[in-house]
Amino acid sequence: MSRIGRMPIKIPPDVKITIEGNTVRVEGPKGRLEREIPANTKLVVENGRAVIEKAGEEKPGTAMLGLTRTLVANMVDGVTKGFQRNLELTGVGYRASLQGRKLVMTLGYSHPVEYEPPADIEIEVPAVTRIIIRGADKEKVGRVAAKIRSFRSPEPYKGKGVRYEGEKIRLKAGKAGLKKR
């Protein structure tokens, strides 16, 4: 049995978990999340703890224990604390702003790039070169951050573009050593 799958998930008092068939619903102060868990695993909630168990004795159930436990633990963390991803814009004239809920970015194209986030994702722009993405669903926060980064990925020569906070970009040397004839 998986070591991660064996660990119980601590459930805070303000979080409510309901199970209907293979659907797990987690409700808390930051929202409500719902996810299907594999049919060969089951979730048991007791005394403020949740434990993932195999539904049968077949091997696929064992293989999914750690994944299922981590997904449910992320749901519990999401509805209590939430998740956040920070992005930085690097480059001359690269800037971001909010127009209502819509994120508008100037990324060196001939037109501004506009992005409308999903309803349960919150975007904040504290400075023109910083974007903060928050939400209860870890997967969705990461997907939105990756989508925004894909509008102008950091290029390898000067590092200009949208990058995750703290991301290191390996720069290439360029054509500096070229001889003239």
From Swiss-Prot:
GO terms for cellular component: cytosolic large ribosomal subunit. The keyword Acyltransferase does not apply. GO terms for biological process: cytoplasmic translation. InterPro entries: Ribosomal_uL6-like, Ribosomal_uL6-like_a/b-dom_sf, Ribosomal_uL6_a/b-dom, Ribosomal_uL6_bac-type, Ribosomal_uL6_CS. Signal peptide: none annotated. Pfam families: Ribosomal_L6 (PF00347). It comes from the Bacteria. Keywords: Ribonucleoprotein, Ribosomal protein, RNA-binding, rRNA-binding. Belongs to the universal ribosomal protein uL6 family. This protein binds to the 23S rRNA, and is important in its secondary structure. It is located near the subunit interface in the base of the L7/L12 stalk, and near the tRNA binding site of the peptidyltransferase center. This is Large ribosomal subunit protein uL6. The gene is rplF.
